[in-house]
Amino acid sequence: MRRVVITGLGIVSCLGNDKDTVSANLRAGRPGIRFNPSYAEMGLRSHVSGSVDLNLEELIDRKVFRFMGDAAAYAYLAMEQAIKDSGLTPEQISNPRTGLIAGSGGASTLNQMEAIDTLREKGVKRIGPYRVTRTMGSTVSACLATPFQIKGVNYSISSACATSAHCIGQAMEQIQLGKQDVVFAGGGEEEHWSQSCLFDAMGALSTQYNETPEKASRAYDAKRDGFVIAGGGGMVVVEELEHALKRGAKIYAEIVGYGATSDGYDMVAPSGEGAIRCMQQALATVDAPIDYLNTHGTSTPVGDVAEIRGVREVFGDKAPAISSTKSLSGHSLGAAGVHEAIYCLLMMEGGFIAGSANIDELDPEVADLPILRETRENAKLDTVMSNSFGFGGTNATLVLKRWQG
């Protein structure tokens, strides 16, 4: 079986818009969650979010940007970073052996809303020709593959909050099967009240910490009350090992495990059993102990406990250090999987583990496991696991191992 490594990364998030800033904020335990005035103005019960601070029109050429909503734009900027980080040449990028798998959870509800408003107020001819590419399910892969001249595989996966983790896993499998040598993998997510209101309406978002936004996302705290929605994008360069070595690439880690399962249980409530099978599937190809687990840990009362019960079942009394970076970053939905894979890579590189922030009182249901509440320095991370689960009972687990050379 061909071995697969990660040789580049790029990130746009509420924790920063480059890897160094993100790493520093993770290490310092600085959350990126703020008060969102538009949520309050529109009457949402949740007034907090993890918003990206960028002027997209200034950063992306107009001829490229006109086809994009925010999700695609965030992923585009992340891909620019990942390409630079990887050292790939234009000839290696635009090559039949180089592909792209990237998606989002919700494309662009803002553009859908604006198109409908235009239809009602001015008629169909005034909608314009660019709304389709901004709102279609494959907007992220389409809006990246064209400007970057991708010639290999080119498609999106949309699997709710597991989206970009599945994209990374699928990229690994494309390379293992010999169909590609390099695959850009990841995703993006727009953060706008037009999508956030849907989660607010179902009672999924945090509402009790509007006056203290930085404390609203609090996985494993006894008084957590829902997740904090976020936006952003991330891309990683997934590459066949020998191809990477031949060109002298920097190797962040080897992807040694990938699990993908379905609960087959409930549309929104996790079974826990599906997550167990997912982690077990990912671990089946791993020959080393897990040093750190970045949980899905969204700060919901039900979801956090269900996942931890699964962790207990999989690891027994040998559970690794555990934290949820969503306590700092919020939940970027379709971008969460790649964001958290990147967080793991940055922690592995920097020798630290970001703690689960805002745990004032640890939930008794999870108190028997080694959940870190503060940053752990001088952490030797050789093998790490990251979980991403989504509505509809979809699950993804990635295991990354330090490349020893």
Swiss-Prot record:
Domain Ketosynthase family 3 (KS3): 1-402
Protein origin, superkingdom: Bacteria
Keywords: Acyltransferase, Cytoplasm, Fatty acid biosynthesis, Fatty acid metabolism, Lipid biosynthesis, Lipid metabolism, Transferase
Major site of localization recorded for this protein: cytoplasm
Subcellular location: Cytoplasm
Annotated catalytic residues: 161, 296, 331
Summary of the function given for this chain in its UniProt record: Involved in the type II fatty acid elongation cycle. Catalyzes the elongation of a wide range of acyl-ACP by the addition of two carbons from malonyl-ACP to an acyl acceptor. Can also use unsaturated fatty acids. Catalyzes a key reaction in unsaturated fatty acid (UFA) synthesis, the elongation of the cis-3-decenoyl-ACP produced by FabA.
Record protein name field: 3-oxoacyl-[acyl-carrier-protein] synthase 1
Species, as recorded: Pseudomonas aeruginosa (strain UCBPP-PA14)
